[in-house]
UniProtKB/Swiss-Prot annotation:
This is Ecto-NOX disulfide-thiol exchanger 2. It comes from the Eukaryota. GO terms for biological process: electron transport chain; ultradian rhythm. The keyword Cell membrane applies. Keywords: Biological rhythms, Cell membrane, Coiled coil, Copper, Electron transport, Glycoprotein, Growth regulation, Membrane, NAD, Oxidoreductase, Secreted, Transport. SUPFAM superfamilies: RNA-binding domain, RBD. Changing T71I: Found in a patient with autosomal recessive hearing loss; uncertain significance. Glycosylated. Its cofactor is Cu cation. Residues 293-328, 381-505 form a coiled coil. One of its GO terms (cellular component) is external side of plasma membrane. Changing C505A: No effect on activity.
Length: 610
């Protein structure tokens, strides 16, 4: 019995963002007998492949695929290497040729390959349902299943009377296979009747079930992600500390012994702290806790000694690092000196062009590395000196006025500049010493380049010294100005004390004059205005109320007076205006909640009354 194998090369075309087309090959079923070489040649010719050229000989013999298959051997497919029927890659600009698909009850004819692909709507999330339009009027649900079951498992079909239907697949990728059939012309059997033909249009469809399943899947993925993150956080979380035992005499003796041991001190002191925070200290256990606290205190000296030892080790390590860095810097200077000596015309002419280039590159690299190490060494020295200067500054206590602080900041800036110049001077001296050492090690010959470098360094050194002297002179001038300001400040303070003494004497004289002029004081006491300040206030308030003929509240008056003097009290002002009844009068304005007290100036009317 001859069995037919059904194969179909399906080319799925997906448009990427850059309008480039990617080609995927998948194999689905079509009726094609394996023993018919003519059918295979036609199919391969449609695919743009050269025929195999085997006439009258079947590509594969007739056999039962269920028989004769050994364990571990996969089924034979046209894509298997060695059969020679794997299609070559198709150029992207070449139109894709679709094939005729033969089914039991119908035939599908491909669209024109030169036409653009059919348009589709935006794909809904989790889409498993497709819309199929253009069905023949005589098409049945069985024919629809026969055509689209090649794309995958069909869960449900909803067919309408108007030549369209909705098909729901089991998986999302099956929708892409169904979209491949969009544009195909379908013919039922061999009939050419209009009711037996149609043009398929396949598009994405929205379905509540698809959206619900997609949301459930997203929630499941979110739960899995949260669970994974929680497990990761729990894995990275530090372990909980062990529980602390409750206080007892036996545990107290154990903790007291651990407190005396350096290796177990941390554990024991944590237990002691927990007991104290729990409130285990009482009159009966106070002595035990005091002895444990005393044992903990005995470790203070040990910790201080350890800190001092570590600081000493750190200083020694810093010193070793500084010495090693100085040694490395000296060796770099020697290497740079070798490069400079090789760059002289006496030796330079004997090197090739490539060798000269390499020597120049090496020299630049060595100089850069030397400068970096030199800056690092100078930075270490600068930090040490700044630490010492910071310690000196912290010991001094400065209590100066604004002008004095400005001069101090200028003096500090000059001091820092002085220090930086001193450090640069040390660096130049080190370079001069290194150059002298190089001169002693290299041949005792006249080197115009080195002499020129020495002259330049000496000139720079002299310039730095002159600049340093100028800065020191400016620093001395600023210090002299500072001292002068201090003297001026003392003189001002003395003058202020003298003025205070004179003021006290004047107040005493005024008091004696008041005692002698008692009748005058009596007349003054009888006046409603008791001082010159109150007279000034009366004048200012009168002027203010004169320009406010409808009156003003006491708060409004006081807000105006506060602009002149913040020490004016509202109650004093109101009392003063109440005493002068012929000058100011109070009226009530408004009704109910808007009731308000207003003061008015009545000096012109009071003048007539008095």
């Amino acid at each position: 019995m001859q069995r037919d194998f059904r194969w179909l090369w399906v080319y799925e075309i997906g448009y990427a963002a850059d309008n480039s087309r990617t080609l995927n090959v998948d194999s689905t079923a079509m009726t094609l007998p394996m023993s018919d070489p003519t059918a295979w040649a036609t199919a391969m010719n449609n695919l743009g492949m050269a025929p195999l050229g085997i006439a009258g000989q079947p590509i594969l013999p007739d056999f039962d695929p269920a028989l004769g298959m050994m364990t571990g051997i996969p089924p034979i497919t046209p894509m298997m290497p060695g059969l020679g029927i794997v299609p070559p890659p198709i150029p992207p600009d070449m139109p894709v040729v679709k094939e005729i698909i033969h089914c039991k009850s119908c035939t599908l004819f491909p669209p024109n390959p030169n036409l653009p692909p059919p348009a589709t709507r935006e794909r809904p999330p989790g889409c498993k349902t497709v819309f199929v339009g253009g069905l023949p009027e005589n098409g049945t649900e069985q024919i629809i299943v026969e055509v689209f079951e090649q794309c995958g498992e069909i869960i449900a079909i909803r067919k309408s009377k108007k030549n369209f239907c909705h098909i729901r697949f089991a998986e999302e990728y099956m929708v892409d296979k169904a979209l491949y059939l969009s544009g195909y012309r379908i013919r039922l059997g061999s009939s050419t009747d209009k009711k037996d033909t149609g043009r398929l249009h396949v598009d994405f469809a929205q379905a509540r079930d698809d959206l619900y399943e997609w949301e459930c899947k997203q929630r499941m993925l979110a739960r899995e992600e949260r669970h994974r993150r929680r497990m990761e956080e729990e894995r990275l979380r530090p372990p909980s500390p062990p529980p602390v035992v409750h206080y007892s005499d036996h545990e107290c003796s154990i903790v007291a012994e651990k407190l005396k041991d350096d290796s177990k001190f941390s554990e024991a002191v944590q237990t002691l702290l927990t007991w104290i925070e729990r409130g285990e200290v009482n009159r009966r256990s106070a002595n035990n806790f005091y002895s444990m606290i005393q044992s903990a205190n005995s470790h203070v000296r040990r910790l201080v000694n350890e800190k001092a030892a570590h600081e000493k080790d750190m200083e020694e390590a810093k010193e070793k690092f500084k010495q090693a860095l100085s040694g490395i810097l000296i060796q770099f200077e020697q290497i740079v000196a070798v490069y400079h000596s090789a760059s002289k015309q006496k030796a330079w002419d004997h090197f090739t062009k490539a060798q000269r280039k390499n020597i120049s590159v090496w020299c630049k690299q060595a100089e850069e590395i030397r400068n970096i190490h030199n800056d690092e060494l100078m930075g270490i020295r600068r930090e040490e000196e700044m630490e010492m200067s910071d310690d000196e500054i912290e010991e001094m206590t400065e209590t100066k006025e604004t002008e004095e602080s400005a001069l101090v900041s200028q003096a500090e800036a000059l001091k820092e500049e002085n220090d930086s110049l001193r450090w640069q001077l040390d660096a130049y001296r080190n370079e001069v010493e290194l150059l002298k050492q190089e001169q002693g090690k290299v041949h005792r010959e006249d080197d115009p380049n080195k002499e020129q470098q020495l002259k330049l360094l000496q000139q720079a050194l002299q310039g730095m010294q002159q600049h340093l002297l100028k800065v020191q002179e400016e620093y001395k001038k600023k210090e002299a100005e500072l001292e002068k300001l201090k003297d001026d400040k003392l003189q001002v303070e003395k003058m202020l004390e003298n003025l205070k003494e004179k003021e006290s004497c004047a107040s005493r004289l005024c008091a004696s004059n008041q005692d002698s002029e008692y009748p005058l004081e009596k007349t003054m006491n009888s006046s409603p205005i008791k001082s010159e300040r109150e007279a000034l206030l009366v004048g200012i308030i009168s002027t203010f109320l004169h320009v406010h003929p409808f009156g003003a509240s006491i708060e409004y008056i006081c807000s105006y007076l506060h602009r002149l003097d913040n020490k004016i009290c509202t109650s004093d002002v109101e009392c003063l205006m109440g005493r002068l009844q012929h000058t100011f009068k109070q009226e009530m304005t408004g009704v109910g909640a808007s009731l308000e007290k207003r003061w008015k100036f009545c000096g012109f009317e009071g003048l007539k009354l008095t």
